UniProtKB/Swiss-Prot annotation:
<feature type="active site" description="Nucleophile">
    <location>
        <position position="321"/>
    </location>
</feature>
<feature type="glycosylation site" description="N-linked (GlcNAc...) asparagine">
    <location>
        <position position="270"/>
    </location>
</feature>
<dbReference type="GO" id="GO:0005576">
    <property type="term" value="C:extracellular region"/>
</dbReference>
<feature type="binding site">
    <location>
        <position position="99"/>
    </location>
    <ligand>
        <name>substrate</name>
    </ligand>
</feature>
<comment type="function">
    <text>Endo-1,4-mannanase, a crucial enzyme for depolymerization of seed galactomannans and wood galactoglucomannans.</text>
</comment>
<comment type="similarity">
    <text>Belongs to the glycosyl hydrolase 5 (cellulase A) family.</text>
</comment>
<dbReference type="Pfam" id="PF00150">
    <property type="entry name" value="Cellulase"/>
</dbReference>
<keyword id="KW-0325">Glycoprotein</keyword>
<dbReference type="GO" id="GO:0046355">
    <property type="term" value="P:mannan catabolic process"/>
</dbReference>
<feature type="binding site">
    <location>
        <position position="288"/>
    </location>
    <ligand>
        <name>substrate</name>
    </ligand>
</feature>
<feature type="binding site">
    <location>
        <position position="351"/>
    </location>
    <ligand>
        <name>substrate</name>
    </ligand>
</feature>
<keyword id="KW-0964">Secreted</keyword>
<protein>
    <recommendedName>
        <fullName>Probable mannan endo-1,4-beta-mannosidase A-2</fullName>
        <ecNumber>3.2.1.78</ecNumber>
    </recommendedName>
</protein>
<feature type="signal peptide">
    <location>
        <begin position="1"/>
        <end position="21"/>
    </location>
</feature>
<feature type="glycosylation site" description="N-linked (GlcNAc...) asparagine">
    <location>
        <position position="120"/>
    </location>
</feature>
<dbReference type="InterPro" id="IPR001547">
    <property type="entry name" value="Glyco_hydro_5"/>
</dbReference>
<keyword id="KW-0732">Signal</keyword>
Length: 396
């Protein structure tokens, strides 16, 4: 999903100074504890995995519900992070997809969270308290609350830097330049290595994700395929414990195609070919009919087609993003129902999670619905209950 950076400022999250609701000593102990858990490495843990066409989490194999929160790693109040995970746990949500990137081309003002600076052909990773230590706390809190995280490494869109931030620093005019540039890929891989090494032993990591919605408009599909194959193989060389996926929207699919834009190869993706890459553990697809010029009812075909493709490939598929700007329950509930009935689709993460933080409501990009509302009851509480009922009777 493409989201504006301004939303963080509107949500009161981007401009406040780094501080915690806890006493400073407690913050330091929390961060040291995170380091011990994340880097410690001696305690044997069961990592999330695939089992046939399903996912296995904490020894339980089945269908899992979750959500997205691009903003949680940019929060500066530990208590807010804990609140989100506590509410997720109480609601039965198991997976949260978070932005593992926050790229800039100029160093922000003190107190603004940023993860990596690209300038003049060089990249600097921020491991300080206004950098990756914020993501450290997200992982730490997720571990304590039993929530699993999908962490991605770069954005297709310009929000929070994205591929464009690399192009601005290293030179280039298109996504294809990024995918094929040795200097840019070297910087990108250095960032991957830093993030993976921090959390390599964490049971909270569900999967590493190459990018948010990688595209290469007008490119031959071999460009994205080669980049996905090389990058996923590199991640697996660093970490054989955790799963790896792409973050793709699911574009480029002949199976059950009606010829509409999302099924075409115009954005450079070939879903079937991506699934064939051995170092990709499961597929992802997104759904935004209003952005793609399709109808809401069409979304059911999109879900079924990707389930069929994954079934044929012998890999599960995660319905990783879906959303609308109004009538959430009426429009999104049918997609959830279709996903539950479709073999090959083994989890879904709605876009996006909302909650009331110490600064007020979390950012709303128009697709957000909030904890404790009627929409939350419909699309989370009722959905989790439907999943439990389905798993109880072994119907998926």
């Amino acid at each position: 999903m493409k989201v504006p950076r301004l939303l963080l400022a509107l949500g009161g999250l981007a401009s406040i100074h780094i501080a915690s609701a806890l006493p400073q000593g407690a913050v330091e102990r929390d961060m040291h504890a995170t380091s011990a858990v994340v880097h410690g490495g001696n305690v044997k843990t069961k990592f999330p995995s695939t089992t046939g066409l399903k996912f296995t989490i904490d020894g339980e194999t089945g269908y899992f519900a979750g959500s997205n929160s691009y903003w949680i790693g940019f929060l500066t109040n530990n208590a807010d992070v804990d609140l989100v995970f506590q509410h997720m746990k109480e609601s039965g949500l198991k997976i949260l997809r978070v932005w593992g990137f926050n790229d800039v081309n100029t160093k922000p003002a003190t107190g603004t969270v940023w993860y990596q600076l690209h300038a003049n052909g060089t990249s600097t990773i921020n491991t300080g308290p206004d950098g990756l230590q914020r993501l450290d706390y997200v992982v730490h809190s997720a571990e304590r609350h039993g929530i699993k995280l999908i962490i991605n490494f770069v954005n297709n869109w310009n929000d929070y830097g994205g591929i464009n931030s690399y192009l601005q620093a290293y030179g280039g005019a298109s996504n294809e330049d990024f995918y094929n540039s040795e200097p840019m890929q070297k910087a990108y891989r250095a960032y991957i290595k830093e993030v993976v090494s921090r959390y390599i032993d964490s049971p909270a990591v569900f999967a590493w994700e190459l990018a948010n919605e990688p595209r290469c408009k007008g490119c031959d599909t071999s460009v994205l395929h080669s980049w996905i194959e090389k990058t996923s193989r590199y991640i697996k060389s660093l970490d054989k414990k955790h799963m790896v996926t792409t973050g793709e929207e699911g574009f480029g699919l002949d199976l059950m195609s009606d010829g509409s834009y999302p099924f075409t190869y115009v954005e450079g993706g070939n879903f079937t070919d991506t699934l064939s890459i051995p170092t990709i553990d499961f597929g992802t697809f997104h759904l935004y009919p209003s952005s793609w010029g399709t109808t809401n009812d069409w979304g059911n075909l999109w879900v079924e087609a990707h389930g069929a493709a994954c079934k044929a490939a012998g890999k599960p598929r995660l319905f990783e993003e879906y959303g609308v700007t109004a009538d959430h329950c009426a429009l999104e509930k049918p997609w959830q129902t279709t996903a539950l009935k479709t073999k090959g689709v083994s989890g879904d993460l709605y876009w996006q999670y909302g909650d009331t933080l110490s600064t007020g409501p979390s950012p709303d990009d128009g697709n957000t619905f909030y904890y404790g509302t009627d929409e939350f009851d419909c699309l989370v509480s009722d959905h989790v209950a439907a999943i439990d009922e389905m798993e109880k009777h072994g119907r998926h």
